Amino acid sequence: LEYLKATFPDEDLYFISDCRKSIAKANQKGIKTWLAPNPEMQWQGVRAELNHPLEFRDGFWFKTLARIFVLNSFMQVHQNQEVLQIEADVFLFPSFPISKFIDLNVEISFPMESYDRGIASILYLKNHKISEKLTDIALIEFENNKNLTDMLLLGNIAHSRLLNFLPLPTLPNDMQNALNDANAFGLVCNNSINTSGVFDGISVGQYLLGIDPRNSRGLLKLYRSQSSHAINVDNLTLGLNIDENVVLKDSGRDILVFNLHNHAKDLRLYKEKSRKKLLQKRVKSSGQGEIQELVIKVFLVSVLKSIIRKVRNGLHQQKI
């Protein structure tokens, strides 16, 4: 938040959360905040019927879907205003073209992870009427599919006419050889908002910075290209320009990557010196195959949680 405020000082930045402690910390930094209504209370029925395991990452699958409700609640308070939602683990380079989203002539815009799935790492909503319509669509989709995720929901919207949708470009047209799925070409390779670069939905950031080590008990998996994603990052050449902005290199030209999905939650990105060192290291080693690093802190927390869980299960069995 401090990085965003310093990098984009003229933008109307809000931190949205249902955690009072996080809201208080942001307020202390002089950042505008909005305390969201508790989604577990507002969407009790959805939470109860959702087929995804609620114990995974403290209700991860429910919370990512419930963000639709939270955004709508925020936009009903801030009516007739465009909103560009940036996930907390998405890093924006100073080159990020926020001005391109002003008066965008569509109702909703986001990048696609694959042909079938969208991703809300960057999500543009035109106004409060569209956010309300999106919420209504989400509830209808959920009634038809209890395995619904926010990514499937956005994918369905991308392939329907329920909302006027514009896919954010994630790969230049002339780099289509890096596609895993040729069917995704029109959703991934486009210049829909006339920019000099591309937006990272998840593929480049996850490849370069690693998969969240909490998924593997502290093991950070780097340079893994996901076959389920539209883009095969192994077929791209990554570099850094003079401003230390990640670029896609092709035939002597550099294509800006405006943001990185920081799936690994690496906080070094947000300090200039540590960011420069981190990105130089990661870019230099890219294209040489998958590697793994052990994140000690995450590993120890994982072990501690496992011990606590086993103790609780043992106590529960004794009571029975």
Mark where each language-model region is.
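Catalytic core and acceptor-binding pocket of nucleotide-sugar-dependent glycosyltransferases
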Residues: 132-290
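A structural signal for well-ordered alpha-helical segments within the folded catalytic domains
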Residues: 65-69, 148-156, 298
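Terminal, low-complexity, charged helical segments
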Residues: 3-4, 20, 24, 32-35, ...
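GT-A fold catalytic core of metal-dependent nucleotide-sugar glycosyltransferases
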Residues: 63-109
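N-terminal anchoring/stem segment of glycosyltransferases
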Residues: 1-51, 76, 127-133, 259-312
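An acidic/histidine-cluster motif and surrounding catalytic segment
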Residues: 46-58, 147
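An acidic- and aromatic-residue-enriched active-site/binding cleft used to recognize and process polar
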Residues: 18-21, 85-90, 114-115, 128
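Conserved catalytic core of nucleotide-sugar-dependent glycosyltransferases
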Residues: 93-156
